[in-house]
Swiss-Prot record:
Protein modification: Phosphorylated.
General function of this protein: TFIIIC mediates tRNA and 5S RNA gene activation by binding to intragenic promoter elements. Upstream of the transcription start site, TFIIIC assembles the initiation complex TFIIIB-TFIIIC-tDNA, which is sufficient for RNA polymerase III recruitment and function. Part of the tauA domain of TFIIIC that binds boxA DNA promoter sites of tRNA and similar genes. Sfc4 is the TFIIIB assembling subunit of TFIIIC.
Main location: nucleus
Compositionally biased intervals (Acidic residues): 66-80
Entry-linked InterPro entries: Tfc4/TFIIIC-102/Sfc4, TPR-like_helical_dom_sf, TPR_rpt
Protein name: Transcription factor tau subunit sfc4
Annotated organism of origin: Schizosaccharomyces pombe (strain 972 / ATCC 24843) (Fission yeast)
Gene Ontology biological-process annotations: transcription by RNA polymerase III; transcription initiation at RNA polymerase III promoter
Domain of life of the native organism: Eukaryota
Gene3D superfamilies attached to this UniProt entry: Tetratricopeptide repeat domain
GO molecular function: DNA binding; RNA polymerase III general transcription initiation factor activity
Gene: sfc4
């Protein structure tokens, strides 16, 4: 049977013409009618005991291909009608027609029989001839009572030959074929007959559903989808049946690639069952495949909130179980919602472990709750149950995702604790998780660690594939292990000798190893290979339009070979004249590209075709920078050469594959020319200040502008690479201003991209270059002052060590004695160093802030005290010292708590005295901080007085008669909103709802 084609058996019978019914019956025929009626009456009384004649249908029942309703033809509507009409004589029919005609003559509207106001009678609803009715009754008797399926089948075939619109005959014919066994041929013939019956009665949704299940069993997927569509369009009155049909159709579509249609079906079901986990699972799997997690995240969030309100996971079907939670976590992982993912895994798995009430774990910034080492779970309010391993067992899939989330937020030590558990699992079980970890390390460019996990995966032979070898080759290439990288790419080419990506990487490896002839040959072969492919495609589809793939992809193979006018130079001549001509062309081409950049820059300023102009600008700039970086003379030292090689192996995503190949072939041509006839005259370039008739300043501006534009389009890591490479170029390194501005540009890029981890490198350079200058410490605090991620970068362990070494250097210089672990004093460009003449309170205070952020209150108090001793009249020092004492007093293991609170308020009131005389804004700030301090230790009745004083100075109190504009602070620095909110919380906790409502109405509702 052909899956999607026509049905020859059905078509041949459909084309049969219906025989004319006999007009007159003689007495013998009337006797036969009576005999057949008796047979039908007996058949109707057949009990369920006679089911043995129907054969063994258990196998079909298990497959969902048999139901009692389908086989109970003696009680069907069609047969019932035929049985009733079989006992009616022609005279009765004629009398009824005569009466109807009389009514019509008398002016009454003629009754339409059996249609209840509907249109014309369909072929299937027309009564068959009496001859057909008699044959059908006899076939029923043979099938049901005698179990003579062969004779019943012959009669059914004869009925179909006489009148192919009899549904019951088609159904019986299909049933006869099915009773012959579960063989494929029998089921196919059964399906043919039932499909014909279903088309005769398109509203029979149950029959369409049966045909769909049979089609699925025969792997006729398109036909099964068609039958499900017809069952749904039949609009069954029972909503549960409609949902069943849509569910089966959606599952079928999902399993066979029609993901969009499957998603539409599941979304329809989700409207009536928003918390059904089975529907959510299927939708999650679909959107994970098409990389569109955001389409379903909202529905998962709604369902999660609904189930999470229970103290423990409910029991039943279609509930939010651990696999559903894992899919929810996978969606958050794909959408890069790292903080939400961490929170979901911690709370979700805790809920499934029966520990929902242990919310105190959320107070910790790490994942000690799931540590294999039980000692990290020990803390002051821990109970004996915290040593129960099963209650604190984190499933491996969740541990992998949690580790990746920690890795992406810059918490490398915490991530490694999770990965160490996965790393010790057998590779045949954990290779999928190991691969995800390795890819995560590649994303943050820790290729050494990524390679470590890729090597582990190689121990499991079934996991080895082209993707694994390619990623390993990229890691080896970035780590400058060219021999291993070449082996990986050659392994790919053994399996797939036309793999473009492996060939390109192999060419890059040869280029970096100065084997330019081999690299040029590989690139030329790629051009030839792609030209042959394109010519073959043009021959096969001359009239088809081919989509142009703009932008680079990981594996691209559909782009046309560029018709570059210098493509002919793939095998350049070695003559001096041609080398000179090539150099002239490169110079002219470079100037042309710079001119094109100027034109595009003007277009960007006018905001004309911004997207197209920007992509073109980035592509041209990328080619120019590649051209600059390919000059080895510009990167003499080994460190600078590594930066150059690193940029050469990273191609911007704005350059297409064709552009990459063209750029590479031009570089190789240029390099081969210089190799044979001498490299560029670096002294001449430095003396004249021009390279390819373009000033060094213009090249410098290109690097800076390119990095800034990359940052604006979201490629901040590539911007860092470009700037790092520029820092290694000798043309820029000799100029102090250019060298410093490149660092400032990197800091600007990190600030624009809100990348605090990226800002740490230029900030440490600022500390080193401008030692013992207070503005550097203020800049550090200002850059890392926004949000949670900045806060984590602020307390980075490397920063702590760096600042501690600076403090030790300051102590060493001030005491004239050697201090172990001190930093090195850096000299300025004039050869002199900045030596402090006194202790710097800002540096000590900054380190105290880092200790306080880590909740290390005793070290924080020590450094705050040093800052206080240096400058006792600094308000921020007094405030910080007072708060540190209060926080230390509130810790569980604190000794002499009341004395520490007294010390804390001593410094806080000193801060108040220093601040209150500086102005109304400063006074309001001091009042608010005192109120917050009392609120923090639980003395709320004292806090109320200070909060009310803050509100008295707020511009929001202008309605009061006692308040004038001269006695209020500026709205820019007003603390009234914060004070009102805290005051409202106090009133609510104390049960004074009336006052809380008054505060909200006056200060919090706008």
């Amino acid at each position: 049977m052909i899956q999607n084609g026509g049905n020859s058996y059905v078509d041949s019978n459909m084309n049969e013409t219906q025989n004319d019914t006999t007009d007159n019956f003689d007495a013998e025929m009337q006797d036969l009618n009576g005999y057949i009626s008796e047979i039908v009456d007996e058949a109707r009384n057949v009990s369920e005991v006679d089911a043995k004649f129907l054969g063994d249908t258990s196998a079909l029942q298990a497959e969902g291909l048999w139901s009692d309703e389908e086989s109970d033809y003696e009680g069907s509507d069609d047969e019932s009608n035929f049985s009733k009409t079989a006992s009616r004589t022609e005279d009765d029919i004629a009398n009824e027609e005569w009466e109807e005609n009389l009514k019509a003559v008398a002016g009454f509207r003629k009754v339409r029989k059996g249609h209840k106001g509907r249109g014309r009678v369909s072929r299937a609803d027309m009564l068959p001839s009496v001859e057909v009715q008699q044959m059908l009754s006899l076939a029923n008797h043979l099938f049901a009572q005698e179990g003579n399926f062969d004779e019943a089948q012959k009669l059914a075939e004869e009925i179909v030959r006489i009148d192919n619109n009899v549904i019951a005959a088609w159904k019986m014919l299909g049933e006869c074929h099915r009773q012959r066994g579960n063989g494929r041929v029998n089921i196919e013939k059964c399906l043919i007959a039932w499909m014909a019956a279903a088309h005769l009665k398109p509203k029979d949704h149950e029959l369409w559903f049966t045909c769909a299940k049979l089609s699925e069993s025969l792997e006729f997927w398109d036909q099964a989808d068609y039958c499900y569509n017809r069952a749904v369009s039949a609009k069954p009155p029972n909503k549960s049946e409609l949902k069943k049909y849509i569910w089966n159709r959606s599952v079928l579509n999902k399993e066979h690639g029609s993901l969009k249609k499957a998603a539409e079906g599941f979304k329809f079901l989700l409207q009536s069952s928003p918390y059904n986990a089975s529907i959510l699972k299927n939708l999650a799997e679909i959107y994970i495949k098409i990389h569109a997690p955001r389409e379903i995240l909202k529905q998962f969030e709604i369902a999660w909130k609904y189930f999470y309100q229970y103290p423990a996971p409910p029991i039943g079907n279609d509930i939010f179980d651990l696999p559903t939670l894992n899919l929810y976590a996978e969606l958050l992982l794909l959408d890069h919602q790292w903080s939400n993912l961490i929170r979901l895994i911690n709370r979700g798995v805790r809920w499934f472990r029966g520990r929902k009430s242990e919310s105190f774990w959320d107070e910790f910034d790490d994942d000690r709750e799931w540590d294999v080492d039980e000692r990290r779970r020990e803390f002051p309010n821990a109970s004996e149950e915290h040593t129960n391993k099963e209650a604190y067992l984190l499933p491996h899939l969740f541990r992998t995702k949690l580790g990746i989330a920690r890795l992406k937020t810059g918490e490398l030590p915490e991530a490694e604790l999770h990965f160490s558990v996965i790393k010790n699992l057998p590779p045949d079980y954990a290779w999928g998780m190991l691969y995800d970890i390795a890819k995560a390390y590649m994303d943050i460019e820790r290729l050494d660690l990524a390679l470590e996990y890729f090597v582990l995966i190689c121990n499991h032979e079934p996991a080895q594939n082209i993707g694994l070898w390619y990623n390993m080759g990229v890691c080896y290439l970035e780590l400058k292990e060219y021999e291993h990288a070449q082996q990986c790419m050659e392994a790919i080419l053994i399996v797939d000798n036309s793999n473009t990506n492996a060939l390109i990487k192999l060419a890059e490896i040869n280029e970096l190893q100065d084997n330019r002839d081999a690299a040029l040959e590989i690139v030329t072969n790629i051009f030839e290979q792609r030209r042959n492919i394109n010519e073959l495609e043009r021959e096969q589809s001359q009239n088809e339009d081919h989509e142009k793939n703009v932008g680079s992809q990981l594996f691209v193979g559909n782009q046309k070979v560029p018709q570059d006018k210098w493509e002919k130079r793939a095998r350049i001549s070695r003559s001096k004249e041609e080398a000179r001509q090539f150099t002239i062309w490169k110079t002219e081409e470079t100037q042309r590209r710079f001119h094109k950049l100027d034109i595009l820059r003007q277009s960007l300023k006018k905001e004309e075709n911004v997207s197209e102009s920007l992509n073109e600008w980035l592509a041209i700039a990328s080619e120019l920078i590649d051209e600059f970086v390919s000059i080895k003379a510009f990167f003499p030292s080994e460190k600078k050469a590594r930066a150059r090689a690193g940029l050469l192996t990273r191609r911007t995503r704005y350059a297409s594959l064709n552009d990459q190949l063209t750029s590479m072939i031009n570089r190789l041509n240029d390099s081969l020319t210089r190799t044979k006839y001498g490299d560029l005259d670096l002294d001449t370039i430095l003396r004249t200040g021009y390279f390819r008739n373009v000033s060094i300043d213009a090249w410098y501006q290109l690097f800076v502008e390119f990095s800034l534009r990359l940052t604006k389009v979201g490629s901040v890591q590539q911007a860092y690479d470009v700037l790092t490479t520029a820092m290694g170029a000798i043309l820029f390194d000799q100029d102090t201003i250019k060298r410093q501005n490149l660092r400032w540009c990197m800091l600007a890029c990190s600030m624009y991209a809100r990348d605090p981890q990226g800002a740490l490198t230029p900030l440490r350079w600022v500390f080193t270059t401008f030692q013992f200058r207070q503005d550097t410490y203020r800049l550090f605090s200002a850059v890392l002052s926004q949000g949670y991620e900045c806060s984590r970068a602020f307390v980075d362990s490397a920063n702590q060590k760096f600042l501690l070494r600076l403090i030790k250097l300051m102590d060493q210089l001030m005491s004239n004695s050697l201090v172990s672990g001190a930093a090195t004093l850096v000299k300025n460009d004039d050869g002199l160093a900045t030596v402090p003449t006194s202790y710097d309170p800002v540096l000590v205070l900054l380190y105290g802030h880092i200790m306080a952020r880590n909740r290390s209150w005793i070290p924080a108090i020590n450094y705050y005290s040093r800052a206080f001793a240096i400058n006792p009249d600094c308000p921020i020092t007094n405030l910080s010292l007072g708060l540190a004492y209060l926080h230390r007093a509130m810790q569980r293991l604190s000794d002499n708590r009341h004395y520490q609170i007294l010390q804390g308020f001593t410094f806080l009131y000193r801060y108040y005295d220093l601040r209150v005389n500086e102005g109304l804004g400063e006074k309001q700030e001091a009042l608010y901080n005192l109120g917050k301090a009392y609120h923090f230790i639980g003395l709320e009745h004292y806090a109320v007085k200070y909060y009310e004083a803050v509100l008295g100075l707020s511009p929001m109190s202008q309605g009061d008669k006692m308040t004038s504009s001269e006695s209020t602070v500026s709205t820019t620095y007003d603390f009234g909103f914060e004070a009102a909110y805290n005051l409202r919380l106090i009133y609510i906790c104390s049960g004074n709802i009336k006052l809380a409502f008054q505060i909200s109405s006056k200060y919090l509702i706008f």
